[in-house]
Regions:
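Glycine-rich phosphate-binding active-site loops on the catalytic face of alpha/beta enzymes
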Residues: 40-41, 46-74
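Conserved, mostly hydrophobic/aromatic
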Residues: 26, 50, 89
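Glycine-rich adenosine-cofactor-binding loop
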Residues: 27, 33-45
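Glycine/Thr-rich beta-alpha phosphate-binding loop at enzyme active sites
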Residues: 1-33
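Alpha-helical structural signal in soluble globular domains
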Residues: 25, 29, 53, 73, ...
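Extended, intrinsically disordered, low-complexity segments
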Residues: 16, 72, 76-99
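Glycine- and other small-residue-rich loops at beta-strand/loop junctions that grip anionic moieties
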Residues: 11-15, 36-40, 63
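Active-site-adjacent beta->alpha loops and helix N-cap segments on the catalytic face
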Residues: 11-24, 45, 66-77
Length: 99
């Protein structure tokens, strides 16, 4: 296939494990910087994985291309997950999940 910009990219679900590892390793080396987790987030559970790995915030990218309301759905799902697990919400608020 012909690729317009000569390089190809990887996005969506295939990036999730790479993104999670990058967030975790960055957090262990630089514990005080803000980190935005992105790559493969199409559900509240996957957003929670990034937060648990050490991200301060998450971004929904490719999923929004296929479903424009995906960011709102993911936020709602994440909110529901945290409401159902107050102990996890407290750990996230204290920055203790990735340790």
């Amino acid at each position: 296939p012909i690729i317009a910009n000569v390089t190809g990219g990887v996005s969506g679900p295939a990036v999730l494990p790479i993104g999670l590892a990058a967030v975790y390793h960055t957090r262990t080396v630089l514990p005080d910087i803000p980190i935005i987790g992105l790559g493969g987030i199409d559900s509240g559970e996957k957003a929670l994985e990034y937060l648990y790995a050490g991200a301060n915030a998450v971004e929904v990218g490719a999923a929004a291309l296929f479903d424009p309301v995906a960011p709102l759905r993911v936020a709602r799902e994440l909110d529901d997950l945290l409401d159902s697990r107050p102990e996890l919400a407290a750990k996230l608020a204290a920055g203790q999940t990735w340790r």
